[in-house]
Regions:
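Phosphate-group recognition and catalysis centered on beta-loop-alpha active-site segments
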Residues: 1-227
């Protein structure tokens, strides 16, 4: 089982900040995940929601703001909102999972991926139009289709587009989905798995899955510490 630090290490530090990403990387996780939106002037920045209310108490939306405006914001606990470029620099050679939240595939995302084409970056999104477009334009990139409600439809989309895998809310996971993914060699990523018993159960019964967790240090200790 592979362990992905969710939004860096969301349970240990403010999500999608440089501080959180560094904790996720230091935990020993196999990959560190963060979310990106593209600004009005084409710069991908880290944020989960469309606006900054949750992070910074600001109701303005990412795509309505310039990067210069966003650089002035601070999270509720005083941290900076990083650009995706800053995030990749901070993570060094740590493998990355970049969740694209935009409504379309922006030039800023393509430019970022091209600049870092030698990095181990996987791209995921719940917006399947973005993924189909990315598959056409950058076919070598490892792509994952996210879904909130429709895993069967998403698996058919994955097979049709010949992309790598699916990210799924763990509550929708079941043995049928596992066997389908195993049969068709579809990577399966589950989020967000935090409880120790759940991590150990999935590792024992469904070892092919990977998990996003807010506590990557905990998951690494549970699964990889000497018995």
């Amino acid at each position: 089982m592979k362990i992905f630090g969710h939004r860096g290490a969301r349970g240990l530090e403010t999500e999608n900040t440089i501080e959180s990403l560094k904790i996720g990387a230091a935990s020993g996780a196999d990959r560190v995940e963060f979310d990106v939106w593209t600004t009005k002037d084409g710069i991908p920045v880290l944020n989960h929601n469309a606006d900054f209310w949750h992070m910074a108490g600001d109701k303005r939306r990412v795509f309505d703001m310039t990067y210069a405006e966003i650089k002035k914001l601070r999270t509720l606990d005083g941290k900076k909102i990083p650009s995706a470029e800053e995030a990749l620099r901070a993570l060094g050679n740590v493998p990355v999972y970049m969740e694209v939240k935009d409504f379309y595939l922006s030039f800023g995302i393509l430019e970022l991926l091209d600049k870092h084409k030698d990095r181990d970056i996987w791209v995921g999104s719940n917006n399947h139009k973005i993924l189909a477009d990315l598959k056409k334009k950058r076919p070598a990139i490892k792509i994952y289709a996210g879904t909130l409600w429709h895993p069967i439809e998403t698996m058919h989309f994955i097979r049709k587009q010949d992309i790598h895998g699916m990210s799924l809310q763990y509550r929708w996971f079941n043995p049928v989905i596992y066997q389908f993914c195993k049969h068709y060699d579809i990577d399966l990523l589950l989020y967000t798995v935090n409880r120790p018993w759940h991590i150990k159960f999935l590792n024992k019964i469904y070892p092919r899955v990977s998990i996003f967790t807010d506590y990557p240090d905990r998951a690494v200790k549970l699964l990889r510490s000497p018995k």
